[in-house]
Amino acid sequence: MARSRSNQIGGQPGKINSPRTDTLTEKFICDGGEIKTVKARDLFLLKGNPQLNKDHFTFSKNSKYPYFTRTVFNNGIYGYVDYLDEEHLIKGNSLAVGMMAMQFFYMEHDFYAGQFTKTAFPLFDGFDEKVALWFISWFNKSSKKYLGVLVRDFENEFYETELLVPYKSGKIAIDFIRERVRELEEERVRELEAYLKVAGLTDCSLTLAERETLNNLNSGG
């Protein structure tokens, strides 16, 4: 059951406060939005992944399907593989987690996975990469707690995780989440570009890949 909170969302996602994001939140509240404390079990379904060792796959830089493992590098993706079968294929637009580091990553496309991994599937409409970053920040904030329990107890610990989620008219405020995450991403890029200028590296600019890496770091990945 969700509990309403009248206060703003402080420091999430990305643990950054700025006048722009604070103003965005204030406007959201004034327009009838509210912040609710919701347990993960109300928003996600956690499933163990059908697992296959990497020896079962053919890896290639031109392959289509990500192979997700316990690594925390490259968004948990060990490499890309050719299609194998439907039995082991995991639906994308979901959150994958490796049980060793307990770090969550957004998986846009259908994927295969190795041992000791699970996937959280959203139970609500409108889920995408921007919305995923919001929830990843909360789940990764709980990584130390997850690491402190036995693997067999992780599912219950995950479902009991409390999340602050914006709601409007009885539904998750997807548009607000996307806008706020976008503002936070832009804020971090401005901070880094300001640092480069102070450091005398004004001829440097961030590539698209570097911006994506920065956003992943901001989300706790």
How would you describe each model-predicted region?
Residues 164-166:
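A short, hydrophobic, proline-anchored segment that marks a local hinge/packing element in signaling
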Residues 36-162, 221:
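DNA target-recognition domains and sequence-specific DNA-contacting regions of bacterial/archaeal
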Residues 1-52, 58-75, 168-221:
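Non-catalytic DNA-recognition/assembly elements of restriction-modification systems
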